[in-house]
């Protein structure tokens, strides 16, 4: 089988000698478990995104898990089993799995194929008396219209959560995506805006939730809690007693100290990474905004452009399979738009308590006719022009 050279990969490394030196510092210290570097990264992360608190975890998926879990453990629980959470029909699997794992009713709503985010008109009509939260997913770097979502929930006992794992650095009206909800999650996996090997973060302005996140991140013990906290009140002055005191059913989703050290360096570079992604996007939009048979994602606010969606129009002379073949033969990596329509995954949905709010026509459409190619923190002008020339033929 002929091996095709990759000319335009989905992602590329964001590291240089600064990250390698950070790793070496941790190796030299001989302290590999979560410590001062993680703590500093959390401080830097919260400051960068304008949030009071940040908790680093092992991945964006575990960030979602802790975000949902924490809402069951507040003094006045914000969730109970059976509560309804509205989600878009297009997202990554671990947006949904924590909802199932905690016995919540998942209510799927169609997306808008222009923005790839939840359809706002369908969201409004999807709300029921059981709805407790909207888990908004900012897809492929594109923030939701949170002004509209806030207006929809006005006067209702409904809070907003954000899965911002694909949209680090996106903004709406000058405010960072991930900070519009009660909590927001981020990913720093290799292919994302910054990379800490594996890694994720949860941010919040709520101190009680912050303390719960600290507790359930590491075994549900009190060891990492402040001396006075919202879970146990005043901790014992005896460190031996507090070292193995368990108060919540937690996990072990701690990050490595190495990941924290890398993250400190990566955050310094994030503004330039986002700037270059947006420069690439400007070229992409100029070339593809009037393409005869391809639609592109419509930007809301200031996208951080995780990747570039290519959605075939109904009048397209080629199928998606033919589009994929063209791209692969040209050495251009591509993949479906996240998972496509998640509702096609009947094998796993049999474990869910879920409802569907009407038709999911746009989710189905992008599932069959959409894909995306990568965007990077480096200049891709030649690759994007080449992509356009290939699809002009």
Swiss-Prot record:
It catalyses: GDP-4-dehydro-alpha-D-rhamnose + L-glutamate = GDP-4-dehydro-3,6-dideoxy-alpha-D-mannose + 2-oxoglutarate + NH4(+). It comes from the Bacteria. It is a single-pass membrane protein. Homodimer. The gene is colD. GO terms for biological process: nucleotide-sugar metabolic process; polysaccharide biosynthetic process. It is an enzyme of class 4 (lyase). Keywords: Cell membrane, Lyase, Membrane, Pyridoxal phosphate, Transmembrane, Transmembrane helix. Pyridoxal 5'-phosphate binds at residues 60-61, 92, 166, 187, 252. Belongs to the DegT/DnrJ/EryC1 family. This is GDP-4-keto-6-deoxy-D-mannose 3-dehydratase. It is found in: Cell membrane. Its EC number is 4.2.1.168. Pathway: Nucleotide-sugar metabolism; GDP-L-colitose biosynthesis. Involved in the biosynthesis of L-colitose, a 3,6-dideoxyhexose present in the O-antigen region of lipopolysaccharides (LPS), where it serves as an antigenic determinant and is vital for bacterial defense and survival. Catalyzes the removal of the C3'-hydroxyl group from GDP-4-keto-6-deoxy-D-mannose via a combined transamination-deoxygenation reaction. The catalysis is initiated by a transamination step in which pyridoxal 5'-phosphate (PLP) is converted to pyridoxamine 5'-phosphate (PMP) in the presence of L-glutamate. Its main location: membrane. One of its GO terms (cellular component) is plasma membrane. It holds the Pfam family DegT_DnrJ_EryC1. The active site is at 192 (proton donor/acceptor). GO terms for molecular function: glutamate binding; hydro-lyase activity; protein homodimerization activity; pyridoxal phosphate binding; transaminase activity. Its cofactor is pyridoxal 5'-phosphate. L-glutamate binds at residues 219, 254. The chain crosses the membrane at residues 53-73. It comes from Yersinia pseudotuberculosis. GDP-4-dehydro-alpha-D-rhamnose binds at residues 30-33, 223, 333.
